[in-house]
Curated annotation (Swiss-Prot):
Any one GO MF annotation of this record: L-gulono-1,4-lactone dehydrogenase activity
Function comment: Oxidase that performs selective oxidation of the terminal primary hydroxyl group of several alditols, with a reduction of O2 to H2O2. Shows highest activity on xylitol and D-sorbitol, and a poor efficiency with D-mannitol and L-threitol.
Name this protein carries in UniProt: Alditol oxidase
Pros-8alpha-FAD histidine: modified positions: 46
Assembly and oligomerization: Monomer.
GO CC field: membrane
PANTHER family membership: D-ARABINONO-1,4-LACTONE OXIDASE (PTHR43762:SF1), L-GULONOLACTONE OXIDASE (PTHR43762)
Gene from which this protein is expressed: xyoA
Binding site for xylitol: 106, 320, 322, 345, 375
Family assignment from sequence similarity: Belongs to the oxygen-dependent FAD-linked oxidoreductase family.
Annotated keywords: FAD, Flavoprotein, Oxidoreductase
Length: 418
């Protein structure tokens, strides 16, 4: 049988596998895992590197054929969600039961399991990564057996943001809170020169979730997106002018795809993402990178980016600045430190983008910038150990749960070799 190929959402990566398996029951999944020599799980495909490449004659496993599980416990304010469920579906079910997630990423079309496995996040000085609300992980391990790791287990710090290296995540249990409404306000032209460390903190704390956007063609930020919970005050925003029309983070792109703006109230899950769930992206003419740094270095890091903006701008569609509260997941880019995140949406030209990524990484070295695991980066494996102080502990956990390395690949081995 010849190998099959699968491309990611952006089309910049082609995964090669012996087979693409789509089990329709947990029993079938357990049998397939036990019978396969090497396994990687294919989520929603919104990664931009080879994290899902099985290699070595391995198989790709899709959870899309499994029954969709979203079991809400309203009394406990928790939800058990299946490994193949995406945030848009989860949010609709949870909201219908009068509950909510505390945060979401910019795109609601991504899978829950894949998002928390790579440290994906939204924004907000008080909001942790998406993994921070996980209270329990259910895994199918290398021999096909099920292992449950819950908050309080000494292994839990390595079990959620795990890069798919421990087993197949078949379900996650998440903490919820009462449903709330939000409104979104967009402002334009926030000068970098007007920001000192205290003002930057004030800007990023001006609402429940704040994002700054720039194309680095000039100093400063072209757009500021404030997402306010209606049960919390917004005392004005004197640092930039209100937008005169609905905006898209990427100049020239249709704003109809974005969530409601101009302060129109709506459910949390229709305001926290930047993009509407009804808008289903079929492919993305883009590459993405992201680097997360201690928040106390935010302004210095922004000036370091501004110093190389003539290098960045020609291959950049937009750059988004967000904040993430510290969390306790060993491989989370926000592990142990309140964080500022700089996300880059590049043009779809790998040859042109990679040299710029390397130059950017050089500029951010003084700020201990951790790369997002699911995006384009070139940080050498040898530098990751200094960036992730619990990397050796994670390697020991992976070795204990998967001693033969069934769930590893070249990407994971490179990380663990750090």
């Amino acid at each position: 049988m010849s190998d099959i190929t699968v491309t990611n959402w952006a089309g910049n990566i082609t995964y090669t596998a012996k087979e693409l398996l789509r089990p329709h029951s947990l029993d079938a999944l357990r049998a397939l895992v036990a019978d396969s020599a090497r396994v990687r799980v294919l989520g929603s495909g919104h990664s931009f590197n080879e994290i899902a490449e099985p290699g070595d004659g391995g198989v790709l496993l899709s959870l899309a054929g499994l029954p969709s599980v979203v079991d809400v416990d309203t009394a406990a304010r928790t939800v058990r969600v299946g490994g193949g469920v995406r945030y848009a579906e989860l949010a609709r079910v949870v909201h219908a039961r009068g509950l909510a997630l505390p945060n979401m990423a910019s795109l609601p079309h991504i899978s829950v399991a894949g998002s928390v496995a790579t440290g994906t996040h939204g924004s907000g000085v008080g909001n942790g990564s998406l993994a921070s609300v996980v209270r329990e992980v259910e895994l199918v391990t290398a021999d096909g057996s099920t292992v449950v790791i819950a908050r309080g287990d000494e292994r839990f710090g390595g079990a959620v943001t795990s890069l798919g290296a421990l087993g197949v995540v078949t379900s996650l249990t998440l903490d919820l809170e009462p449903a709330y409404e939000m409104e979104q306000h967009v402002f334009t032209e926030l000068p970098l020169a007007g920001l000192d460390p205290a003002t930057f903190e004030t800007v990023m704390a001006a609402a429940y979730s704040v994002s700054l956007f720039t194309d680095w063609r000039a100093p400063g930020f072209r757009q500021v997106w404030l997402k306010r919970r209606t049960d919390r005050p917004l005392d004005g925003f004197p640092y930039a002018a209100p937008a005169a029309e609905k905006m898209h983070p990427v100049p020239g792109m249709p704003a109809v795809n974005c969530t409601e703006q101009f302060g129109v109230p709506g459910p949390w899950h229709e305001r926290l993402p930047h993009f509407r769930a009804e808008f289903t992206p079929s492919s993305g003419a883009e590459l993405q990178s992201e680097y997360l740094m201690p928040r106390e270095h935010a302004l210095a890091a922004l000036h370091a980016m501004d110093a190389i903006r003539e290098t960045l701008a020609p291959v950049l569609q937009t750059c988004e600045i967000r904040t993430v509260a510290a969390d306790a997941q060993w491989l989370s880019p926000a592990y142990g430190r309140d964080t500022v995140a700089a996300h880059f949406t590049w043009v779809e030209d790998t040859a042109a983008v990679l040299p710029v990524v390397r130059r950017l990484e050089e500029a951010l070295v003084p700020f201990a910038a951790r790369p997002h695991w699911g995006k384009v980066f070139t940080v050498p494996a040898g530098e990751l150990r200094a960036l992730y102080p619990r990397l050796a502990d994670f390697g020991a956990l992976a070795g204990a749960l998967d001693p033969a390395g069934k769930f590893t690949n070249a990407f994971v081995r490179g990380v663990l070799a750090g």
